[in-house]
């Protein structure tokens, strides 16, 4: 089954796609937050995605803060547009730090450009490793 991972941000949303059986993850790019629901719906329909994994930004202690509420509001919009697609919230603590580690050595502009999609790939890698 194809799986799409989403790293939601207030400006940009990182996307990655993968396969549950093959455990392969590929970057799908970034979209603006304003266009994210529409673009995700297009990808789900075009690529026959069966699950969407959305990173939930918990605090280091595991609690939900203001950013988690924004993500949950976004997920509700996704669920309205994709009623037949399973949408899973996934603990994304430390994914940005790991993404920045992977991007070490790149110019700051390139890091900013790639951070969200790399974070989405990490979310998907973690999910696929758990199933």
Curated annotation (Swiss-Prot):
Per the record, GO CC terms? cytoplasm
Keywords attached to this Swiss-Prot or TrEMBL record, sorted alphabetically, are:
Cytoplasm, Hydrolase, Nuclease, Ribosome biogenesis
Q: Name one Pfam family in it.
A: RuvX
What is the protein's known function?
Answer: Could be a nuclease involved in processing of the 5'-end of pre-16S rRNA.
Localization in the cell: Cytoplasm
Q: What is its main location?
A: cytoplasm
Q: Which SUPFAM superfamilies match?
A: Ribonuclease H-like
User: What EC number(s) are associated with this protein in UniProt?
Assistant: 3.1.-.-
Molecular function, one GO term: nuclease activity
The intrachain disulfides are none
Q: What is the lineage of its organism?
A: Bacteria, Pseudomonadati, Aquificota, Aquificia, Aquificales
Name the UniProt record assigns to this protein: Putative pre-16S rRNA nuclease
Q: What family, per the record?
A: Belongs to the YqgF nuclease family.
- Is Cytoplasm among this UniProt entry's keywords? yes
A GO biological-process term: rRNA 5'-end processing
């Amino acid at each position: 089954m194809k799986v799409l991972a989403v790293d939601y941000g207030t400006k940009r949303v990182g996307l990655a796609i993968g396969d549950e059986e093959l455990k392969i993850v590929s970057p799908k790019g970034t979209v603006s937050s304003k266009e994210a629901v529409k673009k995700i719906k297009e990808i789900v329909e075009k690529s026959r995605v069966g699950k969407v994994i959305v990173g939930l930004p918990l605090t280091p202690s595991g609690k939900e803060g203001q950013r988690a509420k924004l993500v949950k509001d976004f997920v509700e919009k996704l669920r309205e547009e994709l009623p037949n697609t399973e949408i899973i919230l996934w603990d994304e603590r430390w994914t940005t730090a790991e993404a920045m580690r992977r991007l070490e050595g790149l110019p700051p502009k390139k890091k900013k450009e790639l951070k969200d999609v790399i974070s989405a790939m990490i979310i998907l890698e973690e999910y696929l490793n758990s199933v």
